[in-house]
Amino acid sequence: MSACQTPIIVALDFPTRDAALKLADQLDPKLCRVKVGKELFTSCAAEIVGTLRDKGFEVFLDLKFHDIPNTTAMAVKAAAEMGVWMVNVHCSGGLRMMAACREELDKRSGPQPLLIGVTVLTSMEREDLAGIGLDIEPQEQVLRLAALAEKAGMDGLVCSALEATALKTAHPSLQLVTPGIRPAGSAQDDQRRILTPRQALDAGSDYLVIGRPISQAADPAKALASVVAELA
């Protein structure tokens, strides 16, 4: 497998295997990793992960597990056995849930995926949190959940780039994965707390998840190359 040389993760947000692989075939695994989310995984199951790995890609399995500790830990174990590079769980599942996942991965003798916690979804603003009983700013909730994640031994966090600087300051050992990345001139779509790729790295993000600006471009390879050039 070719080691990726950039922090870019391209989101394969498609409903079918054929559509996802059509995009993957236009991308260079040395220039990006790929993310498999709920829609594609539900459609294709584990087979899509194996196919992408065979093409040389490191795979971020973005299923955001959230259940009782044992159930979530077993799901993370199954993801590791697929050979994924990164897997995530919701920090709001609590300390015991995250710690159970860490413990399960630490039992493995082979390669371990990065275990990443999801803090506050980048589509959520203060009024969204208020609707679920949290009358606080998203950034405050992110910091609360980050402290739990570090205590549980997580490798990193999914967070908005707008929270990255504060998180790196408070938790420098955690790797930060940032969705909602939009190259200059791109539409915001349904993401709200967003920055450009360069702004996100400068803020402290370690990995950048980019979807539609690459996946819906007329020339995805050219769009990817443009982002790589922006980061050079």
UniProtKB/Swiss-Prot annotation:
Family, similarity comment: Belongs to the OMP decarboxylase family. Type 1 subfamily.
Pathway(s): Pyrimidine metabolism; UMP biosynthesis via de novo pathway; UMP from orotate: step 2/2
GO cellular component annotations of the record: cytosol
SUPFAM superfamilies, per the entry: Ribulose-phoshate binding barrel (SSF51366)
Gene3D superfamilies attached to this UniProt entry: Aldolase class I
Catalytic activity: orotidine 5'-phosphate + H(+) = UMP + CO2
Active-site annotation: K64 (proton donor)
PROSITE patterns found in the cross-reference section: OMPDECASE
CDD domains according to UniProt: OMP_decarboxylase_like (cd04725)
Subunit structure: Homodimer.
Disulphides: none
Gene Ontology terms describing biological process: 'de novo' pyrimidine nucleobase biosynthetic process; 'de novo' UMP biosynthetic process
Sequence positions that bind substrate: 13, 35, 62-71, 122, 182, 191, 211-212
UniProt EC number: 4.1.1.23
UniProt keyword annotations, A-Z: Decarboxylase, Lyase, Pyrimidine biosynthesis
GO MF, one example: orotidine-5'-phosphate decarboxylase activity
Role according to the record: Catalyzes the decarboxylation of orotidine 5'-monophosphate (OMP) to uridine 5'-monophosphate (UMP).
Organism: Pseudomonas fluorescens (strain Pf0-1)
Presence of the UniProt keyword Lyase in the record: yes
UniProt name for this protein: Orotidine 5'-phosphate decarboxylase
NCBIfam families the record matches: PRK00230.1, pyrF
Entries under InterPro entries matching the protein: Aldolase_TIM (IPR013785), OMPdecase (IPR014732), OMPdecase_AS (IPR018089), OMPdecase_bac (IPR047596), OMPdeCOase_dom (IPR001754), RibuloseP-bd_barrel (IPR011060)
